[in-house]
């Protein structure tokens, strides 16, 4: 295998930038802790990414504006809580954690941010949604993107 066979850097001991996808799920929290431990052992930094999916329906008509404001406030509140949690974990373990919150399609946003921060690896929690067996989970879509090593934490 030659260096031109892929985009992965050869000659390093491990990732220097680990992107971890987070939300409020139990598997996401486990993924965050796994990534934090990996970063501590490897001397890497973490980019913790929270993406709120944007619904394309329900915003028009009576009450649509109020619903949009409520969803935006919930997004901000959740993002602030996650950013604080990330800062506490970073301080506790002595690792650098950058928190990024975004809105949109989780797959597209994680890919975009991973490219921007030049992530060497991605860590996500396994999906518990039954529908993902039909359309594919975020983890499967990230693996199929074939751009980064992806670790899926159960």
Named regions from a protein language model:
Residues 1-13, 88-122:
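Structural beta-alpha unit
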Residues 7-65:
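Small/aliphatic-rich secondary-structure junction motif
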Residues 44-45, 95, 119, 148:
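Short glycine/serine/threonine/alanine-rich loop segments
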Residues 47, 98, 151:
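Conserved beta-strand positions in the Rossmann-like core of class I SAM-dependent methyltransferases
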Residues 50, 125-127, 154:
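Short secondary-structure boundary segments
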Residues 63-67, 116-118, 140-141:
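Short, hinge-like loop/turn segments at secondary-structure boundaries
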Residues 66-81:
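A short acidic, glycine-rich active-site loop
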Residues 121-145:
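Glycine-rich, Arg-bearing micro-motifs that act as flexible, cationic patches
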